[in-house]
């Protein structure tokens, strides 16, 4: 999705009270902040198989039910255990392996790694975004070598239509069979159903797919990303206990939780605390709503963004009136690596003691994107989130997406600072 066109559409449709459907964790979202979807959910704030210049990667490789790769490892045969008992699942962008070579992954910060994305088709088949099945084989092998579980993530941003068609009528049996085949023929340990946006009417199919996979492959791990919630709008979470009954992890996409919408002030991509009517999203407020809806804490995870959000002038900090400011860059367009190499300075860094996250502030537009305020996560905010996970008894964290956190020009041992922080603060 083209970043600026999506941003313009977000602003227009949000003003009209409609679901923009431009954003989410997955294929097709380049740089906008997460779009509000129906029911008050944020449709995720991350993910995309495009960069700010357009589509990357080669032709898609079709995944059906007849691959002849090696047998799958049972999910239970990989411990994945950590000192804290928490999980850490990072999403690896299949369309951009050059940005983060598998050989450079900091495995000590992960218990699970998800190959993103396999795209569902109306006939129940799937295509791997980027079209490189060997990449999946290599990632699975490397993960297992390091004691990390490998997950096939299905869907991504704007995948709702594909899921609905693949799970309709007689197609759902074929779709589920192909998912089982993906497990048994590649070595994946589980399936991640990244259905975005997921409306109330989609919930029965989400449950049906998991049940079919569990019946055929009882040892498979089942995970699902879920939306952050706008407290002004609320959300109908009555179906989530049934979803939690058939999924092992429900991970909140708690990044990209800001925008330049009517009625909003400038805000953070991933605020831990502090919500009001003009900044209506935080991790804590969302977690409380899911827990109140009887989602078990031990199955609930929170998200950490490996990218930031960039606002234009006159905004220079969080919780300011927009006064014409726009959100000019987000996922893919302003990765953590780009923030650290093109924007960061100790004098620009500030700390929001209420939201418990950092930000960069500039008095005038800062190249290359003209940012005057950048929200992002760093080692200190990850430590805060790790402490929160432990205090609340939550299951763990996810990261969108791993490729954006890699500092290729840093010295060896210093190229994955965010994963190192997760190792220290979440897993131990």
Regions found by a protein language model. Name each.
Residues 83-183, 316, 323-324, 348, ...:
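Glycan-recognition patch characteristic of GH18 chitinases/ENGases
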Residues 122-134, 195-339:
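Substrate-binding surface in catalytic domains of secreted glycosidases
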Residues 113, 152, 193, 250, ...:
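Conserved, mostly hydrophobic/aromatic
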Residues 155, 190-196:
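Mobile, glycine-rich extracellular loop/lid and propeptide segments
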Residues 95-103, 132-139, 174-179, 231-240, ...:
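Alpha-helical scaffolding within the catalytic cores
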Residues 18-83:
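Ser/Thr-rich, Pro/Gly/Ala-heavy low-complexity intrinsically disordered linkers and tails
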Residues 8-20:
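Bacterial N-terminal signal peptides
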Residues 109-110, 261, 299, 304-390, ...:
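Glycan-binding loop/region signatures in secreted carbohydrate-active enzymes
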């Amino acid at each position: 999705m083209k970043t600026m066109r999506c941003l313009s559409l977000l602003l227009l449709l949000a003003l009209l009270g409609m679901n923009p459907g431009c954003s989410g964790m997955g294929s097709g979202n380049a740089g906008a902040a997460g779009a509000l979807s129906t029911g008050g959910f944020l449709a995720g704030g991350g993910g995309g198989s495009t960069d700010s210049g357009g589509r990357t990667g080669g032709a898609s490789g079709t995944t059906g039910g007849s691959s002849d790769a090696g047998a799958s490892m049972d999910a239970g045969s990989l411990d994945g255990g950590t000192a804290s008992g928490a999980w850490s699942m990072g999403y690896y962008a299949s369309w951009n392996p050059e940005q983060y070579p598998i050989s450079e992954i900091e495995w000590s910060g992960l218990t699970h790694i998800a190959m993103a994305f396999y795209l569902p088709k109306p006939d129940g088949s799937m295509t791997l975004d980027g079209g490189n099945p060997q990449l999946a084989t290599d990632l699975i092998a490397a993960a297992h070598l390091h004691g990390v579980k490998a997950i096939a993530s299905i869907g991504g941003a704007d995948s709702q239509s594909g899921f609905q068609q693949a799970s309709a009528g007689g197609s759902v049996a074929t779709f589920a069979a192909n998912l089982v085949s993906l497990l048994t023929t590649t070595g994946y340990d589980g399936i991640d159903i990244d259905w975005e946006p997921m409306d109330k009417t989609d919930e029965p199919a989400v449950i049906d797919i998991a049940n079919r996979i569990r019946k055929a492959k009882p040892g498979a791990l089942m995970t699902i990303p879920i939306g952050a919630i706008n407290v002004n709008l609320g959300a109908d979470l009555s179906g989530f206990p049934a979803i939690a009954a058939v999924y092992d992890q429900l991970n909140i996409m708690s990044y990209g939780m800001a925008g330049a919408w009517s009625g909003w002030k400038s805000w953070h991509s991933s605020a831990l605390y502090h919500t009001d009517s003009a900044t209506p999203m935080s991790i804590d407020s969302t977690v409380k709503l899911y827990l109140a809806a009887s989602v078990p804490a031990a199955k609930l995870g929170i998200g950490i963004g490996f990218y930031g959000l960039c606002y234009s002038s006159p905004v220079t900090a969080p919780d300011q009136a927009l006064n014409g400011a726009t959100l000019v860059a987000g996922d893919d367009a302003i990765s953590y690596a780009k923030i650290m190499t093109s924007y960061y300075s100790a004098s620009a860094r500030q700390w929001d003691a209420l939201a418990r996250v950092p930000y960069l502030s500039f008095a005038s537009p800062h190249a290359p994107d003209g940012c005057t305020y950048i929200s992002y996560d760093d080692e200190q905010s990850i430590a805060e989130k790790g402490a929160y996970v432990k205090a609340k008894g939550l299951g763990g964290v996810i990261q969108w997406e791993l490729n954006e956190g890699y500092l290729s020009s840093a010295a060896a041992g210093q190229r994955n600072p965010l994963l190192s922080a997760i190792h220290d603060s979440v897993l131990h």
